[in-house]
Amino acid sequence: TKTTRAFLDEVTELTGVEFDPQNPQRLLKELGAVSRFVGATLQNTSNPTRLDGGYKTNVIPGSAQGSVDVRFLPEQEEYVRAKLQELAGDRVRIETEFEDIGLEVPFSGTVVDAMVDALSAEDPDAVVLPYMLGAGTDNKSLSRLGITGYGFVPLQLPPELDFTGMFHGVDERVPVSSLEFGSRVLVRLL
């Protein structure tokens, strides 16, 4: 997407490592723990999260079911749906429990300028980059109402913290100093 390309161009500028679409890992490895997070914005993703079938260990089930968490890039919904059905085959029925949109918004305007100013006031060396979130966000619902929203989480995390590796985990956390920094930035923004 345009947002992801702008992000990667900025990372190239910061690291001196060119982005090669044929070998994205070369640049992604420069990002450390966030490489998995950013890598998910380069492609549609699917992760099987549940499998269930049968009622007893020694009985072959007549049917089974599974759940797959699918995230797609903007305007890729139909392609992904068709590809999943192709991969699953004709004997598998796919049911959608929940579907959201892929969302991309322009990284410009008074709100973005205010976020950059608030962050720069607390950390003059901060580099603000556009980013497209592949996960769920209220901004997807707000966009249906004509409201453009932005995620803004100014935490100033220590480089050694694998923050993205803790998402939705039993030990998800951030340092208190990161929250204090973020609070100061948000007060400036508001």
How would you describe each model-predicted region?
Residues 1-181, 187:
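Metal-dependent amide/peptide-bond hydrolase catalytic core
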